[in-house]
From Swiss-Prot:
Name of this chain's protein: Apolipoprotein A-I
Lineage: Eukaryota, Metazoa, Chordata, Craniata, Vertebrata
Compartments where found: Secreted
Domain of life: Eukaryota
Coiled coil: none
Organism: Castor canadensis (American beaver)
Methionine sulfoxide found at: 109, 193
GO biological process, one term: phospholipid efflux
InterPro entries in alphabetical order: ApoA_E, Apolipoprotein_A1/A4/E
Leader sequence residues: 1-18
Predominant subcellular localization, coarse grouping: secreted
Sequence repeats: 67-88, 89-110, 111-121, 122-143, 144-165, 166-187, 188-207, 208-229, 230-240, 241-264
Modification note: Glycosylated. Palmitoylated.
Amino acid sequence: MKAVVLTVAVLFLTGSQARHFWQQDDPQSPWDRVKDFATLYVDAVKDTGRDYVSQFESSALGKQLNLKLLDNWDTLGSSISKLREQLGPVTQEFWDNLEKDTEWLRQEMNKDLEEVKQKVQPYLEEFQKKWQEEVERYRQKVEPLSTELREGARQKLQELQEKLTPLGEELRDHARTHVDVLRTQLAPYSDKMRERLAERLTALKDSASFAEYHAKASEHLKTLREKAKPAIEDLGQGLLPVLENLKASFLSAIDDAAKKLSSQ
């Protein structure tokens, strides 16, 4: 599972950077991120599971049981891949329809975000300027101490650490002060965004278009279920031989073990 966790963590980190609030490039759509995450997670689980199965079959117990789990796992993986290929166009159509139906709401929220961005930008620039000034002051204070360390070598290391400690604490305290000021400055805009979002959602709920959207969403889900049903049934049929083979191998292993015990 470590590989799965690492894969998911990498996806979230890169995704959060790609959708940074202040970036200028067009961000990836939410639906594309959902699809990419699902695909990456399934692939990670499948690959990690295969590694565990391979390790078990290579063990002494796995060789003794001879369940042929790896062959069954590969067959299962092929069936799942086939299902994904069959459902690909169906799910794509569903996401496209849903994205189209909610386009107006995203446009309104983007307008609100752009307005807030322009208003808070001066505060962010001021915060960045003050922080750079603090770092520069810290650097100027530390630089003579670094020179002193190079000249005095090890005997002055402890003395240098004692001198650096209050400087680091001073930088930390100043940073906290600037962050608190920035948080206070941005709080009204954060509250305003929450109020606007609540207003948008309330207006959406009370509007006639909400019932229409709900009907469209229900229709899209119904269509998705109908189109996915044959593919899921095919997957079930494809898994039957795998399950039967696994059952037969397991029963055979138990029978062999019983014979060995009775012959002793």
